Design a protein with these regions (language model features):
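Nucleic-acid endo/exonuclease domains
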Residues: 1-102, 106-131
Length: 131
């Protein structure tokens, strides 16, 4: 797994650019003071954005969430723990009053990026107004 980047991935960069284009600069990257180190955070507004890889985080119903055929037991356990940890992190963040936004890698593909941009704008605006 060493070859897999933990931060500054292409999907994250797409979301950074999207946020700037939408007029929401000023975010923090890989913010270490919050549960699970959100990929993108607005600490003052308590908004956490996680850019989730469909393969690693098991996006339900997504064609990119395939399971390797070799060492299936290993992969099943690894993926189950990833999903469990994601749920724990989300629950902890929400318990602390954070609004959690998850963006799946497949939602950044050309055919879905416009609807993803609109959903992101809507969720961020709501959080900005709510404060």
């Amino acid at each position: 797994m060493q070859g897999n980047k933990r931060r500054d991935t292409k999907p994250e960069m797409v979301v950074w650019k999207m946020l700037r284009e939408l007029g929401f600069p000023g975010y923090r990257l890989d913010w270490k003071k919050a549960h699970g180190h959100p990929d993108i955070a607005y600490p003052g507004r308590k908004i956490a954005i996680y850019v989730m890889g469909c393969f690693w985080h098991r996006h339900e119903g997504c064609k990119y969430a395939s399971t390797p055929k070799t060492h299936a037991d290993y992969w099943e356990a690894k993926f189950a723990r990833n999903v469990e940890r994601d749920a724990e992190v989300r629950a902890a963040m929400e318990a602390d009053g954070w609004q959690v936004v998850e963006i799946w890698e497949c939602e950044l593909k050309k055919d879905r990026i416009d609807e993803t941009r609109e959903r992101l704008r809507s969720e961020i605006e709501y959080a900005f107004i709510k404060m």
